[in-house]
Amino acid sequence: MGGCEVREFLLQFGFFLPLLTAWPGDCSHVSNNQVVLLDTTTVLGELGWKTYPLNGWDAITEMDEHNRPIHTYQVCNVMEPNQNNWLRTNWISRDAAQKIYVEMKFTLRDCNSIPWVLGTCKETFNLFYMESDESHGIKFKPNQYTKIDTIAADESFTQMDLGDRILKLNTEIREVGPIERKGFYLAFQDIGACIALVSVRVFYKKCPFTVRNLAMFPDTIPRVDSSSLVEVRGSCVKSAEERDTPKLYCGADGDWLVPLGRCICSTGYEEIEGSCHACRPGFYKAFAGNTKCSKCPPHSLTYMEATSVCQCEKGYFRAEKDPPSMACTRPPSAPRNVVFNINETALILEWSPPSDTGGRKDLTYSVICKKCGLDTSQCEDCGGGLRFIPRHTGLINNSVIVLDFVSHVNYTFEIEAMNGVSELSFSPKPFTAITVTTDQDAPSLIGVVRKDWASQNSIALSWQAPAFSNGAILDYEIKYYEKEHEQLTYSSTRSKAPSVIITGLKPATKYVFHIRVRTATGYSGYSQKFEFETGDETSDMAAEQGQILVIATAAVGGFTLLVILTLFFLITGRCQWYIKAKMKSEEKRRNHLQNGHLRFPGIKTYIDPDTYEDPSLAVHEFAKEIDPSRIRIERVIGAGEFGEVCSGRLKTPGKREIPVAIKTLKGGHMDRQRRDFLREASIMGQFDHPNIIRLEGVVTKRSFPAIGVEAFCPSFLRAGFLNSIQAPHPVPGGGSLPPRIPAGRPVMIVVEYMENGSLDSFLRKHDGHFTVIQLVGMLRGIASGMKYLSDMGYVHRDLAARNILVNSNLVCKVSDFGLSRVLEDDPEAAYTTTGGKIPIRWTAPEAIAYRKFSSASDAWSYGIVMWEVMSYGERPYWEMSNQDVILSIEEGYRLPAPMGCPASLHQLMLHCWQKERNHRPKFTDIVSFLDKLIRNPSALHTLVEDILVMPESPGEVPEYPLFVTVGDWLDSIKMGQYKNNFVAAGFTTFDLISRMSIDDIRRIGVILIGHQRRIVSSIQTLRLHMMHIQEKGFHV
């Protein structure tokens, strides 16, 4: 019976047994969320409750075995009717309570077990209360009390229970509220029951003080309304700080609910059993969080508590961007084993890495050059006369090439090794020196270069022969380039004499010239650079005016003889006309010919067929008409935009048959399709480049030979070709003319045949069969073709592997000009489409958003083609929808490197995918970059998946948040729900995560595409952070 038993009751008039004194006074368990206002079991003295009338309720007090009082009130006036006996408590202070709970323990006699009381005995009693701000003393007015409830017993006892010494104790709890005054009274009304009130406990509930997630929450009283919660903001424990605002909600039953936010231990402190403790000496914690303190990394120490960073030992340093978890390092020792190799034009220095790298991987080298005379103690800086390839500072590889050195000179090269902490050390940088004496047999440098004259497109130069030629001079090499395009591209020519006339230059443009001499012993070094500027149109006109003035003056001098004067003017005028005509002819030739290449300055070399009112005029202007009898069609090889594509043979006059592909226009075509078909032929006819598909010609003539139907593409005939040919008609004298084609209707476009078809299908068919250098060769061919188009001011708009054709020699050629448009001379110009489908996966963001195309958008597409080639024809962005692709690119996501892709190629892809189109590389730069890779295949050996070392130049690494754990990284990108997936799959370090591909992300259970995209994008950023990008921007 609730764990507390009343053994006996004292019977009045024979109804109760005496109460046993074995009543346990501390039987009630009080929860820590209850505040007790009254508990009769703990009162040591008399309760002093008031009874009305006096002979109603009786107070009985007994002592238990611990000599503690047991206070009981009982009443059993069941023999008399109309009972109204009241028992009132003393005044009870409500404290902070808004709602109180009354717990009553009592026994009640079954009326049926008492004889002769059926009309007067009751089995319930009533509970009342009254609020007041102070005690009323003995005054009692029942009508001032409010009824709480009628209390009935769950179990009642009988005479038999008394005989068997069985006590049935009832426990009832009632709640009262809201309580607004300072206190209250309770009253119990008996209306004729036989009852013993064993104990009364009055309490209210609270949410007790607690500590959750390192945040303290005070005692909180819940609201009266059980459906509402009280929001409580916590305060962090000592040495902790908020990560997110800590909150708890207090429920009506005194329970804390819905924990939100948390506190974390500050730097230098760790969590131990719900509080933050300072890190011990020799340990540190660099970041606020609930991780443990870590032992100081090698070569660092601390003697204090609560340390956030360990101090480096003497002679060791920590770079600015080194994480606190990284060991302290020191500068490297000097490089070793310096050797050199010299020829007529270049000096190659090589060395071994230092024996002590200082514990770092960001090792770089610098080469300092000094020129020394016979006395090596007197040296001077080499100045800017020498060129170092790739540079003389910040070298990553342990070699450098020196150019433009002078013969007969002693050069001393000091090679220094440095790392990320070298600048923090005050000790002199160790170096290894080597002295090289240049070839005494090679010729010395030439003398000063002079400009003899300059015209609008030409410059005449002369110079002094070298002081020491050491043999007969064979010739001079002159290298020159536009000053504004320095180091991008250059031209060269040769001269037998110490003078030259350079033609084909741009007007009013500064050029830089370098000259060296060649003898039987080899080349000299290049001279210092000399700058000269071509003339403009105004200067040429002034020269002509000067010539006229001289002629006129000479004419006036012969005024004495009229006949002689007349003859003089006639002869002079004729010579003048002849000279001018010759000069203009020569100038025209120079304008069109420069070092063997035709140039047309200021003239747009591509003509848009849309400028022709009749598209057939453009076709005849740019495409060669082919006699249909020379074409033999063999089979269908595919379907194009306008019809089917067949393979066949073309017989050329005086030559053997060549394989060709024939594009046809399907029957029942619309006028717009006919115009577009003509337009593509007109476009292709203007191109002549080994990496652009070659147009052999078109068939558009009205008359058609009587050739067998089986010679044509069968489905081409079924599509309506025969219906477009007029039937043969009779002629006088018998016979008939051959069938005719309606006027102006295009029939066929004939192009060169590419045996291996489209590049994407070809790569998928030969997955993994090619070397990296072969793939780079394919990419170089595509870039060369696109450079040709870009130089003509032409935008392709649909560059993709499916539109690249491959011949039997693996030569790749750009094709499919259906979407192409002309680009104006303005370098910032872009073409705006008027509609039509855009290939989203290959198209630059600005072209998708604003339908603006430029050579820069073609560069973006070229980056996608690179990815297709290196992945052997995989679909870009895999199964992502077009909308997901657009959103991903806007969020900064870029395709990861395909498996086995060299880092240099993926870096080029990323440059092509720059969001700002002006930052993307030009096709000229791309071709030059790929040429360098082909000439230096070792640059292709480093794969993206191999680049897992720390950056070699911390100052050049982009900013990136530093995370201690993989979980922190996932939380930062709001992907914390996948922590267990990463741990279960073994991806517990950033080294492993940086290697993950999209397939790995799917494999560990990331199903949602949006989540895959966010994680892969962050991994790309992480991987770039771990890579060393030697210089910002794109360089060739």
Swiss-Prot record:
<keyword id="KW-0067">ATP-binding</keyword>
<keyword id="KW-0675">Receptor</keyword>
<dbReference type="InterPro" id="IPR013761">
    <property type="entry name" value="SAM/pointed_sf"/>
</dbReference>
<dbReference type="InterPro" id="IPR008266">
    <property type="entry name" value="Tyr_kinase_AS"/>
</dbReference>
<dbReference type="InterPro" id="IPR001245">
    <property type="entry name" value="Ser-Thr/Tyr_kinase_cat_dom"/>
</dbReference>
<dbReference type="InterPro" id="IPR027936">
    <property type="entry name" value="Eph_TM"/>
</dbReference>
<feature type="transmembrane region" description="Helical">
    <location>
        <begin position="551"/>
        <end position="571"/>
    </location>
</feature>
<dbReference type="InterPro" id="IPR016257">
    <property type="entry name" value="Tyr_kinase_ephrin_rcpt"/>
</dbReference>
<feature type="topological domain" description="Cytoplasmic">
    <location>
        <begin position="572"/>
        <end position="1036"/>
    </location>
</feature>
<feature type="modified residue" description="Phosphotyrosine; by autocatalysis">
    <location>
        <position position="612"/>
    </location>
</feature>
<keyword id="KW-0325">Glycoprotein</keyword>
<dbReference type="InterPro" id="IPR009030">
    <property type="entry name" value="Growth_fac_rcpt_cys_sf"/>
</dbReference>
<dbReference type="InterPro" id="IPR034280">
    <property type="entry name" value="EphA6_rcpt_lig-bd"/>
</dbReference>
<dbReference type="InterPro" id="IPR001660">
    <property type="entry name" value="SAM"/>
</dbReference>
<dbReference type="GO" id="GO:0048013">
    <property type="term" value="P:ephrin receptor signaling pathway"/>
</dbReference>
<feature type="domain" description="Fibronectin type-III 1">
    <location>
        <begin position="331"/>
        <end position="441"/>
    </location>
</feature>
<comment type="similarity">
    <text>Belongs to the protein kinase superfamily. Tyr protein kinase family. Ephrin receptor subfamily.</text>
</comment>
<dbReference type="Pfam" id="PF07699">
    <property type="entry name" value="Ephrin_rec_like"/>
</dbReference>
<feature type="glycosylation site" description="N-linked (GlcNAc...) asparagine">
    <location>
        <position position="397"/>
    </location>
</feature>
<dbReference type="GO" id="GO:0030425">
    <property type="term" value="C:dendrite"/>
</dbReference>
<feature type="domain" description="Protein kinase">
    <location>
        <begin position="631"/>
        <end position="944"/>
    </location>
</feature>
<dbReference type="Pfam" id="PF14575">
    <property type="entry name" value="EphA2_TM"/>
</dbReference>
<dbReference type="Pfam" id="PF00536">
    <property type="entry name" value="SAM_1"/>
</dbReference>
<keyword id="KW-1133">Transmembrane helix</keyword>
<feature type="glycosylation site" description="N-linked (GlcNAc...) asparagine">
    <location>
        <position position="410"/>
    </location>
</feature>
<dbReference type="InterPro" id="IPR001426">
    <property type="entry name" value="Tyr_kinase_rcpt_V_CS"/>
</dbReference>
<dbReference type="InterPro" id="IPR008979">
    <property type="entry name" value="Galactose-bd-like_sf"/>
</dbReference>
<feature type="domain" description="SAM">
    <location>
        <begin position="961"/>
        <end position="1025"/>
    </location>
</feature>
<dbReference type="InterPro" id="IPR017441">
    <property type="entry name" value="Protein_kinase_ATP_BS"/>
</dbReference>
<keyword id="KW-0812">Transmembrane</keyword>
<feature type="signal peptide">
    <location>
        <begin position="1"/>
        <end position="22"/>
    </location>
</feature>
<dbReference type="GO" id="GO:0007411">
    <property type="term" value="P:axon guidance"/>
</dbReference>
<feature type="short sequence motif" description="PDZ-binding">
    <location>
        <begin position="1034"/>
        <end position="1036"/>
    </location>
</feature>
<feature type="glycosylation site" description="N-linked (GlcNAc...) asparagine">
    <location>
        <position position="343"/>
    </location>
</feature>
<dbReference type="InterPro" id="IPR042746">
    <property type="entry name" value="EPH-A6_SAM"/>
</dbReference>
<dbReference type="InterPro" id="IPR050449">
    <property type="entry name" value="Ephrin_rcpt_TKs"/>
</dbReference>
<keyword id="KW-0597">Phosphoprotein</keyword>
<protein>
    <recommendedName>
        <fullName>Ephrin type-A receptor 6</fullName>
        <ecNumber>2.7.10.1</ecNumber>
    </recommendedName>
</protein>
<feature type="modified residue" description="Phosphotyrosine; by autocatalysis">
    <location>
        <position position="606"/>
    </location>
</feature>
<dbReference type="InterPro" id="IPR001090">
    <property type="entry name" value="Ephrin_rcpt_lig-bd_dom"/>
</dbReference>
<dbReference type="Pfam" id="PF00041">
    <property type="entry name" value="fn3"/>
</dbReference>
<feature type="modified residue" description="Phosphotyrosine; by autocatalysis">
    <location>
        <position position="978"/>
    </location>
</feature>
